[in-house]
Amino acid sequence: MKKMILIAGPCVIESKDLIFKVAKQLKNFNENPNIEFYFKSSFDKANRTSINSFRGPGLEEGLKILQSVKDEFGMKILTDIHESNQANPVSEVADVLQIPAFLCRQTDLLVAAAKTKAKVNIKKGQFLNPSDIKYSVKKVLQTRGIEDEGYEAAQKNGVFVAERGASFGYGNLVVDMRSLVIMREFAPVIFDATHSVQMPGAAGGSSGGKSEFVEPLARAAAAVGIDGFFFETHINPCEALCDGPNMLDLTRLKNCVNTLLEIQNII
């Protein structure tokens, strides 16, 4: 059976203690031979709705904490970058550089990520036609000297894309499952099940969300046939400092992932 990519962890690095508690509970996924696991957390949430919102510990301290997760648990790391000058230092720790959805067309950022040895996960913007993600993929591939296009070229050269919902009026997102099929023509596809149920800005200065839809949408995406899943998860989402309303409670993740593996095995 083909390995399923699983990206999971808290939205933002709230503290080293929390990160280690979550990583400890995720280590079974890292040891599962059917899963290609990446621990995810952000050192800086640079696009929070309000200037008063918690952003994280910053680059230097954040990378130290992520490196300690790597050392302690043997996990691969995924984290996002927001500026081109972050690509090189972050790639010294992270195995995957994530391009945020709002920045998925930023050429300088994509090129900077492509010039590192890290894999690159491009999150499709909420505003973007799914077929247009191919141009972002091509920016990475061509920077790496790859003229070939398509799924195999992207897979071979460490580029994948993530679906995280499309804007549906103000303060709401919907998932068009057709986008998973369309984007998979250009690169391996990850379904970001937690951000797909986000309600941007709906909580008055912060984003809301409908976490009860995380698992049903993930199952639907698995049935379409994709390469992996992205879950932001927390010990207590109600107390999370970022994206709590759309995060999956850590106690629900194991059963959810097992179900996705079963669906993947069937199709």
Swiss-Prot record:
> Which SUPFAM superfamilies is this protein grouped with?
Aldolase
Q: Which GO terms describe its biological process?
A: keto-3-deoxy-D-manno-octulosonic acid biosynthetic process
- Which InterPro entries does this one have? Aldolase_TIM, DAHP1/KDSA, KDO8P_synthase
Protein family according to the UniProt entry: Belongs to the KdsA family.
Where is the major localization of this protein?
A: cytoplasm
Give the molecular function GO annotations. Answer: 3-deoxy-8-phosphooctulonate synthase activity
Record EC number: 2.5.1.55
PANTHER family reported for this sequence: PHOSPHO-2-DEHYDRO-3-DEOXYHEPTONATE ALDOLASE
The pathway where this protein functions is: Carbohydrate biosynthesis; 3-deoxy-D-manno-octulosonate biosynthesis; 3-deoxy-D-manno-octulosonate from D-ribulose 5-phosphate: step 2/3; Bacterial outer membrane biogenesis; lipopolysaccharide biosynthesis
Q: Which reaction does it catalyse?
A: D-arabinose 5-phosphate + phosphoenolpyruvate + H2O = 3-deoxy-alpha-D-manno-2-octulosonate-8-phosphate + phosphate
Tell me what this protein is called.
Answer: 2-dehydro-3-deoxyphosphooctonate aldolase
- List the GO terms this entry assigns under cellular component, sorted alphabetically: cytoplasm
The primary gene name is kdsA
Q: Which UniProt keywords apply?
A: Cytoplasm, Lipopolysaccharide biosynthesis, Transferase
Enzyme kind, highest EC tier: transferase
**Which compartment or compartments is the protein found in?**
Cytoplasm
Species in which this protein is naturally found: Campylobacter jejuni subsp. doylei (strain ATCC BAA-1458 / RM4099 / 269.97)
